[in-house]
Amino acid sequence: MSQTGMTIDNVLDSIQHPTDVAKLDADQLRQLADELRERIIGTVSQNGGHLAPSLGVVELTLALLSVFNPDKDKFVWDVGHQAYAWKLLTGRRDEFSTLRQYQGISGFPKMAESPYDHFGVGHSSTSISAAAGMAMARDLAGDDNDVIAIIGDGSMTAGLAFEGLNQAGHQGRRLLVILNDNEMSISKNVGALSLFLSRNLSSRWVRRMKRDVETWLKSVPGIGEEMLNYAKRSEHSLKSFFTPGMLFEAFRFNYVGPVDGHDVRNLAKVMQMARALDEPVLLHVLTKKGKGYEPAESNPTYFHGVGRFELETGAACKFVDSDSLPSYTEVFGSTLCSLAEKDERVIAITAAMPEGTGVGEFSRRFPDRFVDVGICEQHAVTFAAGLAAQGFRPVVAIYSTFLQRSYDQIVHDVCLQKLPVTFCLDRGGLVGEDGPTHHGAFDLSYLRHIPNLTIIAPKDEAELQQAMKTALAGEGPVAIRYPRGIGVGACLSADPGVLEHGRGELLKKGADVAVIAVGSRVHPALAVAEEIERSTGKAVSVFNARFVKPLDAEQLVALARSHDSLLLLEENTTTGGFSSGVLELLADHDCLAGVHVRRLGLPDDFVTHGTQKQLRKLTGIDRAAIRRTLLEMLGLQE
């Protein structure tokens, strides 16, 4: 790589090693930033992904690689939504077209994927804690590498981030936390004075001078202490007026910023000064989410995480099978609004995902009954418990994978007290391209054993409506889990009925083999059973459990006693999941003797990324696997 300013046709393709970025001149860095954005936009338009966050940190990524050595220094990208440029510059340029594709590279940093992904992420607010641990490990090992955590302003709303700040500040180890602020709420602070404060009030020379002046003032008899106190008040007043850093300084971090996150050269200079401080430093960087792509700049919320879109306009690509059918998320959102119209006790709570969970319309129609707590799942659950304790009917709208973060609150604050909180778990089961950090693979297992909790897994969008009305009509906690994606085309109701508590339904009566399914696997099982009967004459029973807890003991025992074989289906890990519960119940009723049982569900493993269709095939829960298993159980050939 040249430092002479010579023109390179394609700078990105010339990068052979991450350290090559440090050899580029200003013009080449600008060209590289443009090329990175072009590659990211083109790939995400085809594959979907987190576009706006990654576009906003291109220059920040270049500055990091201009200053630090990724072969030695450790980087932790919080959540990982913003790590696409990092992937392109750290050896995955040629594979980038496979981003989020089955057997391609992950959409998140992943330790198993690259030696430059120093910590795997996917859920928010973990970076500071992980980096603090790495800094301690470095010091214990006697190494001298830098440790850098890059965290967005959204992730800083979580308690875990402040727990990490508290620990890191207390330990006082050399650590750089970069706060990527893309909300632009304090953009007015970007300017000459802010730059002066960033470069000078925190520089090593000024800090040494300040200590010398303090020592001298203390030696002045009579007025020294008073002068020192006045000087400190003046300095703190100046800094707090122009910067928001006092909060971080309270955690014993040296605050630097805010600085322009799109000025590579200046950002690199500030990083160089920050790394020279032998203590925790928080560098506050201002970026524009979606920068370089007008549709994403105009609508960064939509382009935060997006499916395939038209490159020229940013319009979402249309798919034939989704043009007319609503998604489960949309059905949930519209049903919640309908129920809230009739019951003023209904409160909607989300953890920083109003649109993703379907409560955006609720927030606009019922702003006084809507609460976005930020990325604070633990708080969301206990906050809901407080509302429920006072007679309200809170609905916590959350992705299945994120509810894991509030497990103790579910047990201790909600279920122990039998409070009427409704948990609506979107993305139950295989979520698709976001992969193992986002699959809702464990909820039935980690919720099923909690006393007082009712769990419903509706078979379709109409049953989702019924489940919601059932939950809000009850007097205890209820969890409703449903998959990502469109429904099956079930008829929706303006006034859904209430489900009989703990009662499933026999959809098809047969002989010999009974399929006991729940949630997303019910309709595929029914379709396969009907196909087999048409082609072979063999009638298979199909039972929709509906309730994971309590199970319909009466009907399940009857099925076990009237069939030679049972096939149990779920889109959850079979370890401790729905099928485990069915087997426990049947064993307790002593009706498994002589009954052949097969289970199809998710494995005791972290499932990779890919489309839902690909992953259901991979894990053996798709229609083909159900058909193959049923034919084997019936003693038939394909």
UniProtKB/Swiss-Prot annotation:
Job description of the protein: Catalyzes the acyloin condensation reaction between C atoms 2 and 3 of pyruvate and glyceraldehyde 3-phosphate to yield 1-deoxy-D-xylulose-5-phosphate (DXP).
Protein name: 1-deoxy-D-xylulose-5-phosphate synthase
HAMAP family: DXP_synth (MF_00315)
Reported cofactor(s): Mg(2+); thiamine diphosphate
GO BP terms: 1-deoxy-D-xylulose 5-phosphate biosynthetic process; isopentenyl diphosphate biosynthetic process, methylerythritol 4-phosphate pathway; terpenoid biosynthetic process; thiamine biosynthetic process
Cofactor binding summary note: Binds 1 Mg(2+) ion per subunit. Binds 1 thiamine pyrophosphate per subunit.
Sites where the protein binds thiamine diphosphate: 81, 122-124, 154-155, 182, 293, 377
Any one GO molecular-function label of the UniProt entry: 1-deoxy-D-xylulose-5-phosphate synthase activity
CDD domains documented for this protein: TPP_DXS, TPP_PYR_DXS_TK_like
InterPro entries: Dxylulose-5-P_synthase (IPR005477), THDP-binding (IPR029061), Transketo_C/PFOR_II (IPR009014), Transketolase-like_Pyr-bd (IPR005475), Transketolase_BS (IPR020826), Transketolase_C (IPR033248)
NCBIfam families: dxs (TIGR00204), PRK05444.2-2 (NF003933)
Binding site for Mg(2+): 153, 182
One Pfam family named in its UniProt record: Transket_pyr
CC per GO annotation: cytosol
Annotated family: Belongs to the transketolase family. DXPS subfamily.
EC class (word): transferase
